[in-house]
Every structure is written in C-alpha cells, then in structure tokens.
C-alpha cells in the first residue's frame, strides 16, 4: 500500500501497470467500498495493465485504508474531487483517464467540471438519469450506517449498503459522516461545463442509477452504454463493462 496526503488526510492508493504506460487512468470507487473490492478483486487492475495503461486506484477519504474522519465537513464533494488531482500530482501525472463508479462517478463529474483540462476521457458508471431526481430522505443513508443492526433498516437498498459496509469492515461512523458531507446538486446546466469525451454506463436493472442515456444527454457529446441483466452492484465485474471502457478509450465508441 502506498499513501499520499491531501487536505491533511493520509489517503491510500495502489499503482499498477507499466510505469511508462502510454496513458494513465485513475479509478474512484463507490460508497462503502474500497479500491480492492471495487477494482482489484473485479479484475480491473489486470485488465488495465494488460492494455498498457499506468493505473491508479485510491481509497476515498472515509473508506478502505485511508483516513476516516467523523466530521461531515471533511467530506465536501469538491474536496474529494481535489483528492484525485492531488494523487495525480503526487504521481507526477499531468493528464489521465478518469473512471468513477457510483459515488466515485459523482466525484469524477465534479472533478471534470472543476478542472477538465487534466482529464483525457471521463467514464462515469453506476449513474444515470436518476441523478437529477430527488433521492431518498437526505439523512437516510447515514441513519442506516448508524443503526445498531441491519435488521432495523426497512429500505432494501439501504439495507444492502449496510450489509456491504459490514462485510467490508468499514468504519460506519465515517461512512455516515461521508453521506452527510456537503455537496452541490448536479444540474443539467452545471454539467454543460464538461467538455471532455464522456461515457456513461449503468446496468439495465440498476434501480439506483436509472437509464444512463438520461445523464449522457446532459453532457455535451457524451455516449451511453447499458449493461444487460445487471443491477447496480453486479455490473462492476461484467466483461462488457470493461470492454466498453477500453473501446471508448480507443475511439471505437466515438
């Protein structure tokens, strides 16, 4: 495990693939997950290295082996987006592809709106048209993380996130703080600022994301791919997810 410091927090990351790779890529995982579970275990490290790319995957603040403050103010979405660029600075990388899943997709979109010039291709997965719809009660995810037992959680989606957090042995109070962190609403007008080649991917059965085309339509020139038969979680390991990403990088989906 390697570390870098961002905003006073020690954040863990992995580097993989050839150090002199033709291009770099940064991977940003989803809520309650970590770099190992979201990417390495699902075969992404090997796939990226096999494509000759220099890869980086970080544990977002509050997750995995990174620092886990319990103060919601430390999870400002803008700050979490800056963590991506701080990792790139630490590694001496000026530009990179950026791939984010679920929460990581929100972070990647924020990064692209703030400093898109450092991003080559942008891929956001596990998100779709529902990004523009009112979500669950704002504090519901935090309360699910704070519940004494998953049995106290009525909402099936929230319960699944809680079970996953328990399986990963994550710090549930840090996750609760993360879910309460300040963030700007992603609007269609705001997304017009993204001027990088963008791909939106979601599973056909992803009830959390909704159809990816609904988000792609809001980003100039963006493409959308639906992974058949997959829900929010099962698409991560699907071969078509990987194939779509690499085809996009190689220009086949342009």
Q: Which functions belong to the PLM regions below?
A:
Residues 194, 200-202:
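Short beta-strand/loop motif that positions the catalytic acidic residue
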Residues 106-150:
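Flexible "cap/lid" loop of the alpha/beta hydrolase fold
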Residues 162-187:
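Hydrophobic, aromatic-rich cap/lid helix
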Residues 228-254:
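Catalytic active-site module of serine/aspartate enzymes centered on a nucleophile-bearing elbow/loop
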Residues 9-67:
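Conserved HGGG/HGGXW glycine-rich cap/lid loop of the alpha/beta-hydrolase fold
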Residues 78-96:
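Conserved acidic catalytic loop of the alpha/beta-hydrolase fold
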Residues 207-212:
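Conserved alpha/beta-hydrolase "acid-adjacent" motif
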Residues 29, 96, 100-102:
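Conserved alpha/beta-hydrolase "nucleophile elbow" surrounding the catalytic nucleophile
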